[in-house]
Regions:
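Juxtamembrane/disordered regions of integral membrane proteins
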Residues: 3-134
């Protein structure tokens, strides 16, 4: 029963995060990122490291946020905190070390990661509770 809940939480959180990030990176903000990052961006992202990132990041979200949560509000708040830390370390490191990585990109991506992680963790929690009968 716990394994079923964990699997549902993982799949639900992963699908939510992929949908959100796909819309953000692929549809809504693709031209903005291209304009702001220019030559730093590949024409097509490398699928293997992207897949490993999503699987690993969502695993952390499920272990540290979704499964320990008692309410969706707690999952949202703790998810936002995880997103704030994870995306903050990524964006601040890039700003500190890469030519062409601006404060604008840092703040935009950091805010997005915080929001997307909060939403994905909330969705993962709600679906795990509903479908996992917990």
């Amino acid at each position: 029963r716990q394994m079923k809940k964990a699997l549902i939480a993982y799949v639900a959180t992963l699908l939510a995060f992929l949908l959100l990030d796909g819309l953000w990176l692929g549809v809504l903000m693709a031209p903005t990122y291209r304009e702001l990052l220019g030559s730093l961006m590949l024409e097509k992202p490398l699928l293997l490291p992207a897949a490993v990132f999503y699987c690993l990041y969502v695993f952390g979200c499920v272990v540290f946020v979704v499964l320990p949560a008692a309410t969706w509000q707690w999952a949202a708040k703790r998810g936002a905190l995880v997103g704030l830390v994870a995306y903050g370390t990524y964006d601040l490191t890039n700003w500190a070390t890469l030519r062409g990585w601006s404060v604008q990109v840092t703040l935009m991506d950091w805010a997005w990661g915080t929001f997307a992680t909060a939403v994905a963790c909330s969705v993962g929690f709600l679906l795990a509770r509903r479908l996992g009968k917990v």
